[in-house]
Amino acid sequence: MRISLNWLRELVQVDLEPEVLAEKLTLAGFEVEEIEDRRTWAAGVVVGRVLEREQHPNADRLSVCQVEIGQAEPVTIVCGASNVRADIWVAVATLGSYLPCIDLKLKPTKLRGVRSEGMICSLSELGLTKESEGIHIFPEDAGLQAGQPVGPLLGLDDVVLDLTSTANRADALSLIGIAREVRALTAATLTLPEVELQTYPELPCLAISLQSEACSHYSGTIIEGVTIAPSPEWLQKRLQLAGIRTINNVVDITNYILLEYGQPLHAFDRQKLQAIAGSSDLAIGVRSAQAGETLKTLDDQERTLAEAALVITAGDCPVALAGVMGGADSEVSQETTQLLLEAAWFEPIAVRRSARSQGLRTEASARYERGVNVTELPIATQRAIDLLLQIAGGTVISQTVATTTQTEPEHSITLRLQRINELLGPVQAEDEELKDLGADDIERLLTAIGCHLTLVDDAVWQVRVPPYRYRDLEREIDLIEEVARLYGYDNFGETLPPLGSDEGALSIDESLRRQIRAVCRGVGLTELQHYSLVKPGSDRQVHLANPLLAEYSALRLDLLSGLIDAFQYNWEQGNGPLWGFEIGRIFWREEDGFFEADRMGGILGGDPSRGRWQRGGKEQAIDWYAAKGVLEEIFERFGLTIEFQPDRQDDRFHPGRTASLWLQGDRLGRFGQLHPSLCEGRGLPAEVYAFELDLDVWLDHLDQPERQVPRFQPYSSFPASDRDLAFFVDQSVTVAELERIIRRQGGALLSEVELFDQYCGEHVPENQRSLAFRLTYRASDRTLTEAEVEPVHDQVRQSLVERFRVTLRS
């Protein structure tokens, strides 16, 4: 927002230099991006009177002028403008002056043999326009005097601050809002425009119907006998300084109120509205748009309205996009003599939805989206009416006000001095000592922004927030932030916060997550992070009600899809196979509601080795057992043993090389090789493996008292006793099931179980396979004897026969 310093000083009596004021505003959250000091644009440029104009003796397109500039003698100036002539008032840059807009310093020079002692300026040379057809000529009736500075005449006696508010506040987009901030920062006197509210008749020629909850206040004022003309020069200059193009006096006044109060207004041509409605008595409505309705807006765009858009209607025909832009069919033109002045409060979300549905953002919508101050709406309306009657003439015929809320909102917050000092800490005193903020400081700072403080207890206030700050001052912490902002963040001392007994400690859950990440990195996996937002495509997905992009309008159902995409992207970029893992949240919907859960996923595959020269350059892709070993190693680091069982529930995996993972009877997740058709379709290596685990189940097993403290076990110094166990068993029985029974029956003496042979084929019964295990028995305190080992080993053998009907071979 561009702020005229002269205009600002009419509202708040601040005499700080622009640079000092800009620094204060920036530190208070109103970042001044540029200081445009227009006073330098015309320094040394004065009003001159062209006394004589003669043709240059050596150039057809040059003129030699005698110009009076308030000195003892006229000066000679060679001018190339085609519109220069005698007896006109012009802007003259005198010798020694510097024009920054064209980077030119004036000095005596000769043009085609004639001495020139200055320059007659165009508006572009003074920075007021981009292009000029000739020199600027002042009106004859302007009461000018030769030698007077041109700055005040052209609006070049001002400084413009281009600032951006970092806070989501509508009042920050108005001159009065900035003036209030300056008053709070500098203790300067605030002088707001004097507005005396008037009561106007309410005639049946105007009826207003609020059919949407998104509009709680709407007033329409009918003014007859207005004259459309250019705005006065002072009004045009203020709008131009703010970067707003001037249209005519009526539209310019509504824009002026927009800048001054931050309240968007809109002026309709009443007679055009009557023609649209087909009646002399207007029925203005506020409602949601209907499917298929269209509206031609002021930018000459024919727009098809979304059902979510909020519209203003006349006779139920859309005439404006509420809070965003008016309609072209009812705009004010040179022939307009009757106005309907709209002043309304629209719900911020509704305006944002309307603007977004049309891809349209305007000065009005920017303020409505932040929430304008409904309590100052009558004041802004009256201010606009006063200016309209003063500048455009006319008479107020009728005013109709429709509201859905009868009481003004009241908002009060309990504020504790102790809490303020706990959060903000001490401030730097003048003697460089640190001290806490006092009650007087708090009352002074908050009163300066319009708050009313009532002391209800020792250093405890009930703070009534001013209406223009209702939307951003809602809690105690908001007021504390205001105290810090107004006092100045740089005025607080450097101290450490008080530490409690458990400050700085990680929660058990976070500590375990970090351990999991460290172990995964230790086995060669890179941590990945993907967006939770994905393309829609499943009924089980949770869809966003108001997405930024259609491609990211749903929440992810799993981590696996993102991991596969990442593997494919890295492979296509020539980065080789990706070994990665991700910890994140997934979301899904069911008939009884929405759900979310934390998951851990991983992907690996291809040939990660670098010794291909030893294999004649051939790749050696990781196989199922090696990939499975990576996952097992992760769990072994935590002292956990997982069980693999056949699984065919996910068609993205190979049906014969996929397993569900179980941890002490709890389903943990799934691991397997990606389906060959999926890899072929995506151009991936033939063997890519992935897993997705339920992180909550994993953490529950890790969050056990016996696992919180590391346990160390010495190596046995006594020899082991090995036994081989071979048998035929049905192919439906998994090795995991067999190993579980073997370990259970082997008890404490059985230290290791290893499958070292599997055979299917000749001499093996049909639908069976031959398996051979090596069992290692060991004790930590003695050498085991045959008498100790054999009974245990026989118990293992017998259990396998009874449980799985195996045929023992050894």
Swiss-Prot record:
PANTHER family: PHENYLALANINE--TRNA LIGASE BETA SUBUNIT (PTHR10947:SF0), PHENYLALANYL-TRNA SYNTHETASE BETA CHAIN AND LEUCINE-RICH REPEAT-CONTAINING PROTEIN 47 (PTHR10947). Belongs to the phenylalanyl-tRNA synthetase beta subunit family. Type 1 subfamily. SMART domains: B3_4, B5, FDX-ACB. It catalyses: tRNA(Phe) + L-phenylalanine + ATP = L-phenylalanyl-tRNA(Phe) + AMP + diphosphate + H(+). The keyword ATP-binding applies. It is found in: Cytoplasm. Mg(2+) binds at residues 472, 478, 481-482. This is Phenylalanine--tRNA ligase beta subunit. Its cofactor is Mg(2+). Residues 408-494 form the B5 domain. NCBIfam families: pheT_bact, YtpR. CDD domains: PheRS_beta_core, tRNA_bind_bactPheRS. Residues 39-151 form the tRNA-binding domain. Residues 716-809 form the FDX-ACB domain. Tetramer of two alpha and two beta subunits. Binds 2 magnesium ions per tetramer. GO terms for molecular function: ATP binding; magnesium ion binding; phenylalanine-tRNA ligase activity; tRNA binding. GO terms for biological process: phenylalanyl-tRNA aminoacylation. InterPro entries: aa-tRNA-synth_II/BPL/LPL, B3/B4_tRNA-bd, DNA-bd_dom_put_sf, Fdx_antiC-bd, Fdx_antiC-bd_sf, NA-bd_OB-fold, Phe-tRNA-ligase_IIc_bsu, Phe-tRNA-ligase_IIc_bsu_bact. Keywords: Aminoacyl-tRNA synthetase, ATP-binding, Cytoplasm, Ligase, Magnesium, Metal-binding, Nucleotide-binding, Protein biosynthesis, RNA-binding, tRNA-binding. GO terms for cellular component: phenylalanine-tRNA ligase complex. Its EC number is 6.1.1.20.
